[in-house]
Amino acid sequence: MALQSTLGAVWLGLLLNSLWKVAESKDQVFQPSTVASSEGAVVEIFCNHSVSNAYNFFWYLHFPGCAPRLLVKGSKPSQQGRYNMTYERFSSSLLILQVREADAAVYYCAVE
């Protein structure tokens, strides 16, 4: 059964170009602007960056009116509940397992 919202689907918004730490002005973080999913599916959100000396990825969840919440972090693949993080030198992805309507939020990555 597909989830319904005002847009007819659950949209996971992503904040673009978020950086935890910028070593130089040319360093950037890239994410897609939106990802759609259905209840029970697995959704994958990608994050690429150009920070040559980055050693940690951070994935955050943000609901309007609330402080961002750290979901998962590290310099190697890891899992925290329904959230899995993949890790490579210049990229990471966040997999959300068994997507629920309550997962509709802003997700963003940062590098350190």
Curated annotation (Swiss-Prot):
Record's subunit section: Alpha-beta TR is a heterodimer composed of an alpha and beta chain; disulfide-linked. The alpha-beta TR is associated with the transmembrane signaling CD3 coreceptor proteins to form the TR-CD3 (TcR or TCR). The assembly of alpha-beta TR heterodimers with CD3 occurs in the endoplasmic reticulum where a single alpha-beta TR heterodimer associates with one CD3D-CD3E heterodimer, one CD3G-CD3E heterodimer and one CD247 homodimer forming a stable octameric structure. CD3D-CD3E and CD3G-CD3E heterodimers preferentially associate with TR alpha and TR beta chains, respectively.
GO cellular component, one term: T cell receptor complex
Boundaries of every Ig-like domain copy: 26-112
InterPro entries named in the record: Ig-like_dom, Ig-like_dom_sf, Ig-like_fold, Ig_V-set, TCR_variable_region
Sorted UniProt keywords: Adaptive immunity, Cell membrane, Disulfide bond, Glycoprotein, Immunity, Immunoglobulin domain, Membrane, Receptor, Signal, T cell receptor
PANTHER family: T CELL RECEPTOR ALPHA VARIABLE 16 (PTHR19367:SF18), T-CELL RECEPTOR ALPHA CHAIN V REGION (PTHR19367)
Organism: Homo sapiens
Signal peptide: 1-25
Record GO biological process: adaptive immune response; immune response
Task performed by this protein: V region of the variable domain of T cell receptor (TR) alpha chain that participates in the antigen recognition. Alpha-beta T cell receptors are antigen specific receptors which are essential to the immune response and are present on the cell surface of T lymphocytes. Recognize peptide-major histocompatibility (MH) (pMH) complexes that are displayed by antigen presenting cells (APC), a prerequisite for efficient T cell adaptive immunity against pathogens.
Sugar-bearing residue positions: 48, 84
Protein's name in the database: T cell receptor alpha variable 2
Subcellular location: Cell membrane
Disulfide bonding pattern of the chain: 47-109
